[in-house]
Amino acid sequence: MSNDPPPPYPGGPTAPLLEEKSGAPPTPGRTSPAVMQPPPGMSLPPADIGPPPYEPPGHPMPQPGFIPPHVNADGTYMPSGFYPPPGPHPPMGYYPPGPYPPGPYAGPGGHTATVLVPSGAATTVTVLQGEIFEGAPVQTVCPHCQQAITTKISYEIGLMNFVLGFFCCFMGCDLGCCLIPCLINDFKDVTHTCPSCKAYIYTYKRLC
């Protein structure tokens, strides 16, 4: 038999610990990050590269070949390549004073109106104002025959004649004296008619 000592038992005290051979055991749920090595002759980019700087939305990035439009003092945009002609320009909304053609102003005795005829020429027509119909004939234009006339008047018994007749009866005037107001034209109503076409125009009442 040989005198060599027996080989050490794998589980004996002289066996190296598992931690000494393979290091610390990995922690469950955690994996070591994979580090990619660059190929020979190339270097990794710096790690502090971030997103491009932020610019406010009101100032867009100009593109190559783009010419910004011209902005006037009042805030209006003008297309590129357009320039106003030189010379003084009045501000917007300003109208220089100057002589203007006379308009259709009303003259004495009536008011005027401008009427366009089919030929396109402007014609001034004078329209008479409303006349005051009273106890005397009036010069006017007949609304029926459209002629300049002087009205024809006639007298008719009206309300004022009856009121004066009842007043005479109340004061004791009998024996037909109450009919005296009906015989006076100054107390009667006045009717205006056209002497040409005999059409009725207006009735002037002494007492409404």
Swiss-Prot record:
Gene: CDIP1
Keywords: Apoptosis, Endosome, Lysosome, Membrane, Metal-binding, Zinc
Residues noted as binding Zn(2+) in the record, renumbered to the chain: C142, C145, C194, C197
Annotated segments matching region Membrane-binding amphipathic helix: 164-184
GO molecular function annotations of the record: zinc ion binding
PROSITE patterns linked to this entry: LITAF (PS51837)
Origin superkingdom: Eukaryota
Domain notes: The LITAF domain is stabilized by a bound zinc ion. The LITAF domain contains an amphipathic helix that mediates interaction with lipid membranes.
UniProt membrane topology term: Peripheral membrane protein
GO CC aspect terms: cytoplasmic side of late endosome membrane; cytoplasmic side of lysosomal membrane; nucleus
Biological process according to GO: intrinsic apoptotic signaling pathway in response to DNA damage by p53 class mediator
One Pfam family matching this protein: zf-LITAF-like
Family: Belongs to the CDIP1/LITAF family.
Name of the molecule in the record: Cell death-inducing p53-target protein 1
Organism: Bos taurus (Bovine)
